[in-house]
């Protein structure tokens, strides 16, 4: 009997026993770093001479892994293996597939500290964030397994005299998962195994910055007994194999999390019907945000400042849900800004192995991009806090606050994906909502208010997929906060929702006459 879903807990690091346990996990993981990792096609491990080097963004001298780089021929071999595996996998019952996924999640649960420790090194994640990432991966797998069980019998439709009708779901085929580096386990595992539990086959192309943690999932899937070829692991250069994966005539769906530029490219290319393709491809894309916290008048300014700072600087602002815009009523603007600066000064920045609040940004390209935006911010507004950068050993950017901005400034319009938040002053709540909606994105947002009428207005008019009252705009929880956004934030395919698996299923109707 499958027990009721409940979220996987993290570790309480105020308890010394948990601190000691996680330090041991970090030491154990460090001993294994630097190894070569293969492609995995039809269960076969294939080592290639050409490699992708994964490094610790907090200490660029430390190599995490050398991932074999797939070629187009490797991808072609993976599609052949996938199509063969599909013949058998699609015949498994929904319950059998779901039960196997529950076994996967049980293995991850036992290895949660190890999985989290890897992300501390490979993604520069702080301890709490890394553990939360691992726990969220478990949540996704557990939630989707139960969702598939719920969908197993289809949905009721009407019969009539002499006619019996059935409405049920069937799998689609082979697809491609392209996950991000910022949630290298949770999103990677969720977007890979959601289609799998629905009866499909996946080619997994991990993020170039975080292939090692994705390879660890492959080992767990093998241990759990997933048949060969159901998930094929093809790390590689997106310039070499990215379009090939998306364009392939056997790609039935693409799940992507990443930049707007790449997401729109995938969307466009997926619309083209290739020779030998007799179906329309599905794209499930999450492409980022320019998320805002709106602060009304007559509110708890301490709560507002805390919401802004934690949402802006958690994991160094490298969340698609991170607060990059603080839109504050003129009556409390100065006080909220001052308190936000004070809280920001208390944050620790450094190598996350040492359990700092903030760690590095992921790579040199992001470091340079964020550094450039800070300079733009200095021109458009006033640098209130932070702004410093240091790439002498790792890619470190201080938590940065820029005030005195206008809605059309680049700092307020363009996704930075780093620890930078801009403040803009507004005259009233109507203007605040106008400014909040004044971007191409619509992922998350939050409103700090004690005015119920204003909250109702925000619910109706704040154009985001996930809206929160009197809290920050990050930290969606599987089962409670199905996650996905509007406009250029993506296709609003709500992860962790009762509807998510429908993206990987076809609906079939069978009518039998008597």
From Swiss-Prot:
PROSITE patterns: ALDEHYDE_DEHYDR_CYS, ALDEHYDE_DEHYDR_GLU. GO terms for molecular function: 1-pyrroline-5-carboxylate dehydrogenase activity. Its EC number is 1.2.1.88. It catalyses: L-glutamate 5-semialdehyde + NAD(+) + H2O = L-glutamate + NADH + 2 H(+). Pathway: Amino-acid degradation; L-proline degradation into L-glutamate; L-glutamate from L-proline: step 2/2. This is 1-pyrroline-5-carboxylate dehydrogenase. GO terms for biological process: glutamate biosynthetic process; proline catabolic process to glutamate. InterPro entries: Ald_DH/histidinol_DH, Ald_DH_C, Ald_DH_CS_CYS, Ald_DH_CS_GLU, Ald_DH_N, Aldehyde_DH_dom, Proline_metab_enzyme, RocA. Signal peptide: none annotated. Belongs to the aldehyde dehydrogenase family. RocA subfamily.
């Amino acid at each position: 009997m499958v027990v009721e879903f409940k979220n996987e807990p993290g570790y309480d690091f105020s308890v010394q026993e948990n601190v000691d346990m996680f330090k041991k996990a970090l030491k154990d993981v460090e001993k294994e770093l630097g190894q070569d990792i293969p492609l995995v096609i039809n269960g076969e491990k294939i080592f290639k001479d050409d490699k992708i080097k994964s490094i610790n963004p907090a200490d660029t001298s430390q190599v995490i892994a050398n991932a074999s780089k797939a070629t187009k021929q490797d991808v072609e071999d993976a599609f052949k293996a996938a199509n063969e595996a599909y013949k058998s996998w699609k015949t498994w019952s929904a319950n059998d597939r779901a039960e196997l996924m529950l076994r996967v999640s049980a293995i991850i649960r036992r290895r949660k500290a190890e999985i989290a420790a890897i992300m501390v090194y490979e993604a520069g994640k702080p301890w709490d964030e890394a553990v939360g990432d691992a726990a969220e991966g478990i949540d996704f797998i557990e939630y989707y397994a139960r969702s598939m069980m719920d969908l197993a019998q289809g949905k009721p439709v009407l019969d009539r005299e002499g006619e019996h009708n059935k409405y049920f779901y069937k799998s689609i085929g082979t697809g491609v998962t392209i996950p991000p580096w910022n949630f290298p386990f949770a999103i990677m595992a969720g977007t890979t195994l959601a289609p799998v539990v629905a009866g499909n086959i996946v080619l997994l192309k991990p993020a170039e910055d975080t292939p090692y943690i994705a390879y660890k999932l492959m080992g767990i899937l093998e241990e759990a007994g997933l048949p060969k070829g159901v998930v094929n692991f093809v790390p590689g250069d997106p310039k070499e194999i990215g379009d090939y994966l998306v364009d392939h005539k056997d790609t039935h769906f693409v799940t992507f999390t990443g930049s707007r530029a790449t997401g729109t490219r995938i969307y466009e290319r997926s619309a083209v019907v290739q020779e030998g393709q007799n179906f329309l491809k599905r794209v499930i894309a999450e492409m980022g945000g320019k998320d805002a916290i709106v602060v009304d008048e007559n509110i708890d300014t301490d709560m507002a400042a805390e919401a802004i700072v934690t949402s802006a600087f958690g994991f160094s602002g490298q969340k698609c849900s991170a607060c990059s815009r603080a839109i504050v009523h003129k009556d409390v603007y100065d006080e909220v800004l001052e308190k936000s600066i004070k809280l920001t000064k208390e944050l620790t920045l450094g190598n996350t192995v040492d359990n700092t609040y903030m760690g590095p940004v992921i790579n040199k390209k992001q470091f340079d991009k964020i550094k450039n935006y800070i300079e733009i911010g200095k021109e458009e507004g006033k640098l209130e806090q932070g702004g410093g950068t240091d790439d002498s050993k790792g890619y470190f950017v201080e938590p940065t606050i820029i005030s005195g901005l206008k809605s059309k400034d680049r700092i307020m319009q363009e996704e930075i994906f780093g620890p930078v938040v801009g403040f803009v002053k507004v005259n009233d709540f109507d203007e605040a909502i106008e400014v909040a909606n004044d971007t191409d994105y619509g992922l998350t947002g939050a409103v700090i208010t004690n005015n119920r009428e204003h909250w109702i207005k925000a619910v109706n008019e704040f154009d985001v997929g996930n809206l929160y009252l009197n809290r920050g705009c990050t930290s969606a929880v599987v089962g409670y906060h199905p996650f996905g956004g509007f406009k250029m934030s993506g296709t609003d395919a709500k992860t962790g929702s009762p509807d998510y698996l429908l993206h990987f299923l076809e609906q079939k109707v069978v009518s039998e006459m008597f």
